[in-house]
Regions:
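Aromatic "clamp/platform" in nucleotide-sugar-dependent glycosyltransferases that forms part
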Residues: 227, 246
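Short His-centered aromatic/hydrophobic patch
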Residues: 52-55, 73-79, 97
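Conserved donor-binding/catalytic core segment of Leloir-type glycosyltransferases
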Residues: 151-169, 175-179, 190-193
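Conserved acidic donor-binding segment of nucleotide-sugar-dependent glycosyltransferases
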Residues: 278-279, 283-290, 299-304
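Carbohydrate-associated surface elements
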Residues: 128, 144
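Short hydrophobic beta-strand element within catalytic cores of glycosyltransferases
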Residues: 263-266
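A short, well-ordered alpha-helix in the C-terminal region of glycosyltransferases
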Residues: 292, 299, 306-320, 327-330
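Short, structured helix-loop element that forms part of the nucleotide-activated donor/catalytic region
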Residues: 20-24, 191-219
Length: 337
């Protein structure tokens, strides 16, 4: 954890989170709370306000007990900050904006307004997100690049796609593009690592993807595997990694793959454009442009040396652009440490 030797960090998280305690040892204490997220459900909508007030009251008690003078919200849709201000909390609040607020419509604008009112600092994770927030006082703090070994592209003709199964992520387009070039590359495989998150909409989309995978030239060579804890476990067998999102706030997969030395094929969907240098560390294609996706797949599957050259350029670029030391200095500035 960054700045662990300069401050003590207490983590407040949902009691529905499956993250085991052994992965949270960097925090001096961890509190699991009944944090409710607003969803398209009548019951959840009815319970949202009472749950928000109750959870905020619990948080206020923890902040007093822990004598916390600084509070970070990991995204703008946590409206607890506004309630805490009403309850008298006077500590410093910084709110990260990791999701695109415009995709939530009216409720997104309300959440963002509450975050602005209650926060001392509003932090965007990319230039793209700062533009979507459209406020001059929003700061940018890029996620730091992980310190990982360079793998370089695999000699195996595998394309890897990591991400939860959501229509916005673009797995459907990846399958369509792969089917187009599968006949030319009989040894190539398209491997998905993901999860349906236990959500009905994602489960339905996952079922559609499985059906789509069976109907094309690459039917026998499209695999769906569970999400992995360590990206290296997925990327070590990859010639290239894919990210075909329609809207991507930052693109952690793009950053991780580049750090490992794996070239990316990604859409011009926001964050990836700030990570990938087109033609130098990977390729950028337009959203939903399946023809361009399949063309870039074909190029990297046909030319292992090209994949190695693009992959080799990635680690140096992302390590300079997303230095952990810059991230740590930004946190010191935000929290006046």
């Amino acid at each position: 954890m960054y700045l662990a030797d300069e401050a003590e960090f207490v983590l407040l998280m949902s009691n529905r989170s499956r993250i085991p305690d052994e992965q949270l040892k960097a925090f001096v204490r961890v509190y699991r709370l009944p944090i409710v997220s607003l969803r398209r459900s009548v019951w959840v909508a009815l319970m949202y306000l009472p749950a928000l007030l109750y959870c905020s009251w619990l948080i206020r008690g923890i902040l007093r007990r822990e004598r916390c003078s600084r509070l970070q919200f990991n995204d703008f849709h946590f409206a607890h900050g506004a309630v805490l201000r009403a309850l008298g909390y006077r500590g410093r609040i910084a709110t990260w904006v990791r999701l695109d607020p415009l995709k939530f419509g009216t409720i997104g604008r309300l959440w963002l307004a509450l975050a602005r009112l209650s926060s001392d600092r509003l932090i965007a994770v990319s230039k793209y997100i700062r533009g979507r927030v459209a406020a001059p006082d929003v700061e940018i703090v890029f996620d730091p690049v992980p310190d990982v070994p360079v793998l370089m592209p695999s000699s195996e003709p595998n394309l890897v796609f990591m991400g939860s199964y959501q229509t916005i992520k673009g797995q459907k387009e990846a399958i369509e593009a792969f089917h187009r070039i599968a006949g030319k590359h009989p040894a190539a495989r398209l491997i998905f690592y993901g999860s349906d998150l236990g959500l009905p909409g994602s489960q339905a989309y996952f079922a559609e993807l499985q059906d789509q995978a069976k109907l094309g030239a690459g039917a026998e060579r499209i695999e769906f595997r569970p999400i992995v804890k360590d990206p290296a476990d997925a990327l070590k067998s990859a010639r290239a990694a894919l990210c075909f999102s329609r809207s991507e706030p930052f693109g952690l997969v793009c950053q991780e793959a580049s750090a490992y030395g794996i070239p990316m094929i990604a859409t011009r969907s926001g964050g990836p454009e700030e990570i990938i240098e087109d033609g130098h560390t990977g390729y950028l294609v337009d959203v939903d442009d399946v023809a361009a996706m399949s063309n870039r797949m074909d190029q990297l599957l046909s030319d292992p040396e090209l994949a190695r050259r693009l992959g080799a350029a990635g680690p140096e670029i992302v390590r300079k652009r997303f230095r952990p030391s810059d991230y740590a200095n930004s946190l010191r500035h935000i929290y006046d440490l």
